[in-house]
């Protein structure tokens, strides 16, 4: 059985400011750095053998801290990037016009083919993050990889493993530096393939983590 751990990046300046990030970037806050150190301690205990990360700046900084603790090399994979949120990136969430807010709500309320102008659909996001997960099956026997990505991206990944459409209503809370685990297995009582073991664990963090749409 292959166990794959999923981690969302640490808190960023724009998370704290309620700005929409998408594939734009802002640095980790001091709290985000602390979260990364705490998840790094947990990752070392888990015996992580490979670290695979989105190549955006906030995930890069998070995995630098994790890799120091685990002694693992880092593989950067652009398929693990956050949803491209088009013309809304960098916007303060409270400054959106009614039209812009309607675009944003499409990503939350389960709109088939919902898309922010110049951005991605949830199906496009799902296709690439699931492909990145499938690549873990090519790792050597006994590997225990850690994938570091983003809130909407990881939420979409876990939800589609559960059998939901990529564009389904967003009802899974994955806070900064939360840990989820998915397993690839053959089972008598579960559908063969990927299954969700845990989602959104924050027991390793010593302070509340933000839960904002901007990722």
Swiss-Prot record:
Keyword match Isomerase: yes
SUPFAM superfamilies: Phosphoglycerate mutase-like
UniProt entry keywords in alphabetical sequence: Glycolysis, Isomerase
Protein's name in the database: Probable phosphoglycerate mutase GpmB
Reaction equations catalysed: (2R)-2-phosphoglycerate = (2R)-3-phosphoglycerate
Annotated organism of origin: Shigella dysenteriae serotype 1 (strain Sd197)
Lineage: Bacteria, Pseudomonadati, Pseudomonadota, Gammaproteobacteria, Enterobacterales
Coiled coil: none
Gene Ontology MF annotations: phosphatase activity; phosphoglycerate mutase activity
Residues given in the record as substrate binding sites: 8-15, 21-22, 58, 60, 82-85, 104-105, 151-152
Entry annotation: catalytic residues: 9 (tele-phosphohistidine intermediate), 82 (proton donor/acceptor)
